[in-house]
A protein has these predicted regions:
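C-terminal motif of bacterial Sec signal peptides marking the signal peptidase cleavage site
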Residues: 16-19
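A residue-level marker of the well-folded mature domains of exported/periplasmic proteins
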Residues: 26-302
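Bacterial signal peptide processing site
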Residues: 21-24
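Positively charged n-region of N-terminal signal peptides that target proteins for export
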Residues: 1-11
């Protein structure tokens, strides 16, 4: 049981940060690059920093809540004031994102973050028009090929915590077998995915590998909602998986819809982004979570 508790804690806390990748990455020994970075750091004092953030959602869904906590941690670490940070919530993956980015640049932001996969093309457009503003995009991949020195991508190695949370799930399945709750051939897991994108697929692959590392008989079924955050669709997907015989649920989707369904059905849940204990107090095992604070602090300091 102590081992199980330790893995629960590890699953909740494990994360690994990746540096913001520029489209013009320089070698470590490139003195001209180091010089430019030093000059840039000197030219922007803390009082001159103005940060813009474009969120896909708001504080009511876990993914955006995690980013908001990271921004607040950065603000505290760097001693920034409220008027040095401008946050825009509920910005969809369309032209609205470009308009939001332009507005932030016009308000004097010298670094702008966009948090959703579908924001990337609109941030690229804005970055080309505002070369003196740094644009950083979460979960994207086009910065390196864009030819823009002020466009960057960032994400974490969250597959690592997904693997560990999969181990937690596998141990729970073993416990259910030992207790006689299920048989070995009933170790079927359901996974609520947002979109059939590489990010989601790599995540559930890591999770499933973690499960199978301790429970080799486990199988898994995935249902996509085709939405990053829809409490109703995620709840319906979880209910469908449970009805199909899944005895444990996990997710790569941003709301508490799945955990609500699991609590009602008495089915264990491994969440994402934030703790699911509030909505599944008897069924939440752990969540694959990300602490964005260190990255946001690093990026703004840079």
């Amino acid at each position: 049981m102590k081992k199980f508790a330790a893995l629960l804690l590890a699953g909740a806390m494990a994360f690994s940060m990746m540096a913001c990748g520029s489209s013009s990455d320089k070698k470590a020994g490139d003195k001209s690059s180091d010089s430019k970075k030093t000059e840039s750091a000197k030219s922007t004092s803390a009082s001159d920093i103005k940060v813009g953030v474009i969120y896909i959602g708001d504080e009511n869904e876990g993914y955006t809540e995690a980013h908001m906590k990271g921004i607040q941690e950065m603000k505290k670490e760097l001693g920034l004031s409220d008027d040095q940070i401008i946050e825009k919530t509920l910005i969809p993956e369309d032209e609205t994102c470009y308009d939001a980015a332009v507005d932030l640049a016009e308000q004097g932001c010298n670094i702008i973050f966009g948090t959703s996969f579908g924001h990337e093309s609109y941030l690229l457009q804005a970055a080309a028009e505002y070369p003196d503003v740094q644009f950083c995009h979460a979960t994207g991949y086009q910065a390196a090929s864009s030819g823009l020195d002020n466009m960057h991508n960032y994400f974490t190695a969250v597959y690592e915590s997904r693997y560990v949370s999969g181990v937690v799930a596998g141990l729970k399945l073993n416990e259910m077998i030992e207790n006689g709750d299920i048989k070995e051939d009933q170790t079927k897991i359901g996974y609520v995915g947002a979109y059939p994108y590489a990010e989601v697929k790599s995540g559930y692959t890591a999770f499933f590998l973690g499960v199978r590392s301790v429970c080799p008989s486990a199988t898994m079924k995935v249902i996509y909602t085709n939405s990053w955050a829809s409490i109703d669709l995620e709840k319906e997907a979880a209910e469908s998986l449970i009805a199909d015989g899944c005895v444990l649920i996990s997710q790569h989707a941003d709301t508490t819809g799945a955990s609500t369904a699991c609590e009602k059905a008495g089915v264990p849940i491994v969440g994402y982004n934030v703790s699911m204990i509030a909505t599944a107090p008897t069924q939440a095992l752990t969540s694959a979570s990300i602490d964005w604070g260190p990255y946001y602090t690093y990026a703004v300091k840079s």
